[in-house]
């Protein structure tokens, strides 16, 4: 929609960016208040409120947010109605951001260790003392030409935040490792192979009439759930007279499976084989694009799919042959159709193959390309910075563990951490056993995490509501989107920006380090990227001079270019003639169940989210369980093992065990047990400590053969009764009367 003269005059009268044009925006009245608070006094009007735009950092999606501020205090977070990714919607994690800002257990000031590593015993110091200590150690290493003994571990980064860390590490000769959840690594590797792009593709569900999902819990936590939930709503109800069909393939009954028209409970690790069998039906019933057939088979043609006839693979995948044919025919005849894949489908030793085979179905039905439901995203004119995260593989983490343990090929004399908790996230590698051998550990933390408990120096880091930042949205909604994060409020504690501290260290050390990092602070680095957007003369915000443009992108919460598009259709990937078979750790006779770890909607995979009580209390949609870890089994498995809800069992794998209560999920198939990720922390404040167990600690370190990502669903387990029971905290069902000590139980009923 264009900007009318009346709209433009309103903007000029009410906005600090009077010479800005917002292209392609309807500009709701409410949004006239969304302006940068950088130069606005903290209390503009006592009792009045204002809304400021920024970027959510509670997951990697990068949704746009607006924050309600009254008298200098953030009161509420909502979705930015103008941001193209989420268009005003926000998930529970995004809403809980204010709890992170005002958390009572935040690291309030710099801390220096006084006790043994791991005991979390510290004393408070000033920033001057803390930075003197860190600067001196860094200067000594540079002076000894030992900068390559520095290791930096962060969470996933993009844009100028990633560029600052990359240049800092490059100038020192240090290693920079990004720690992400395993599924992010394998999805990126598979899409790079399937679509030839470093950016994740945009699955426009709202344009499809049929969606076939392989393990991707896109209505739960997969990749960009708010974007996909909006698309799903339009897919179901957004087109008069048209209601799309959803089929979900998953060994666990997830929220996406619960919403599907049909759920195929396949055997774990067989998703790629099922995709090839569907392809066989498409090819042999003339429902597939001939050119795509030739490309996918490297010229071998339709005969290459003959080994995957439904009758030949039915037992291996656990789906009857006729059901495979019915799904394939519906997928081929109900155009446009889209196949998406991720989550547990990629969590095996053949994970990349499973995902690529599923993505290949889109080529067979002509769904890839401009104007179709599977679209590539154009590169934004934002400079030579990392546009996508670069998560480290399991082998890289194993190499770091070995280096810490042996000191070869060189010791780790300085370990710097930000937004990463390897003690918790790499428990399957026993990372905490070797962490103590690092020379000096510095952790930039918002909440004291399990790794920070081992640190020699803990520096309080800003939350995303107190800091500057940028976000190269990935996946974007078919066109490039850059989100701009700005400080919404003044720092609540004595915290600082991790990136600003790196820049100040570079100035203090001097030499090549200072030359590589010319910016005085993160804000100026981001402004450099914004200048390139301004010079392009494209996109949603346009202005005569840069300062007006800068105010405009802050006011809108970002920049996007709806006219940018990738017109070329990528070359389909060549599929293997002999698909790899999923391998599992543990003998099936001794460990009869396949363990399926999954990411709950609230606390996700852990980290600071586990410390937020709102998210601990978010019910898992299918089970309604909260506040603890559980083992989810089906009724057949429960009957065979004599288990009932609330029985405490030991979940034992070949490498470890955890104890959790049982929940009997009527939708769970036999042969699998599902356990949520995200709990079992020893730190993270009062709301996370001692709640549940960390399922990562019992996983075997098997990896996907292609991407090197952790095959987190490749571990077999057994359930052993402990003879104890525990109350399962949930929202569903009746609550029987129970008594308290020294009190008489009273049952309240409706008379």
Language-model features: locations:
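Short, hydrophobic/amphipathic alpha-helical patches that form generic packing surfaces
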Residues: 14, 18, 276-281, 356-363, ...
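A generic structural motif
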Residues: 175-186, 243-246, 367-381, 438-451
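Acidic/polar loop patches that form or flank catalytic/metal-binding clefts of enzymes
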Residues: 30, 75, 288-291, 324-325, ...
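Short, surface-exposed connector motifs at secondary-structure boundaries
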Residues: 142-151, 336-337, 411-414, 437
